[in-house]
Amino acid sequence: MKILAVEFSSEVRSIALLDGETVLAQSAESGGRRTIGLVEEVLQKAGCEREAVETIAVGLGPGSYTGIRGAIAFAQGWQLGREVNLIGISSVECLAARAELENIFGLVDIVVDAQRNEFYLARYEIKAGAHHEIEPLRLAALAEISQRDAAGEKIVGPDIGSWFPRAANLYPDAAVLGRRARARSDFISGDKLEPIYLRETAFKKAPPLRVIE
């Protein structure tokens, strides 16, 4: 099954095309805003036509609300045009899997900047071949993460090293996302895809258009 994985929840946006466990092609860019261009780049590298994609996996965050919304909109449009399977996966889960690949073992705090001096925090137990959630995702204050960092706890996350001196920068990766999706079958329709966001968003939807007669 060919899976197109789209991970836009951090500053490093990435897309990967997988066939089973094999990564056929992948591409990433830092600070970019391309979507279709990245997709076409990956498909071209893999020598694959759009019609060959059977499933699209989307990283649902938490993280960059704009990036996640863009990835969801892309997946929704693709499903409407080609009737592919869609699956959404937590970007924090992908970060835990990425930490496992990087041999970051033990109790690990996955931390993502939530703005306003708050952070998304989840704790995982990570060992070779497995990772398990110990503390579910929640919002935490800057002071709490700073205390954990000062106590020598392992902390990883996107661009988190600029906040906490002992923390390691780690980014969600589309190839990891695609491999996580391969083991899942909980496909959903595009209108059910929503970002993981633990507080009311500052983004407001525009009101419906009024018909002027």
Residue ranges and their predicted role:
Residues 1-20, 30-33, 37, 87-213:
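Oxyanion-binding and handling regions
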Residues 37-39, 70:
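Short, conserved active-site loops that position catalytic residues or coordinate cofactors/metal ions
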Residues 40-41, 76, 80, 179-183:
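Short glycine/serine- and small hydrophobic-enriched flexible loop segments
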